[in-house]
């Protein structure tokens, strides 16, 4: 748990919100496979690795991406 706290404080700042995969999928409406395809093609913000099997996205980056999408 200490690694996550350190990562959060040093890299994203203490006030930045992190979203897990489930939240990103719910907010964007993308499927898991489409989301990762977009990440691979630099069409979506990169995820941050919080541990060996845990990733998260900066909420601000995802919201900015959503704002650029046509309605």
Role assignments for model-derived ranges:
Residues 41-48:
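Short, solvent-exposed alpha-helical "recognition" segments
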Residues 58:
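Extended, folded domain segments that form the structural surfaces/walls around functional sites
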Residues 3-41, 61-63, 67-69:
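Polyanion-binding surface elements
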Residues 48-54:
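Short Lys/Arg-enriched helix C-cap and helix-to-coil transition segments
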């Amino acid at each position: 748990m200490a690694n996550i706290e350190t990562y959060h404080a040093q890299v994203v700042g203490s006030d930045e919100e992190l979203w897990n995969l489930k939240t990103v999928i719910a907010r964007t409406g993308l499927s898991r496979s489409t989301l990762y395809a977009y990440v691979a093609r630099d069409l979506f913000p990169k995820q941050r690795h919080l541990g060996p099997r845990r990733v998260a996205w900066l909420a601000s980056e995802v919201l900015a991406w959503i704002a650029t999408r046509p309605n």
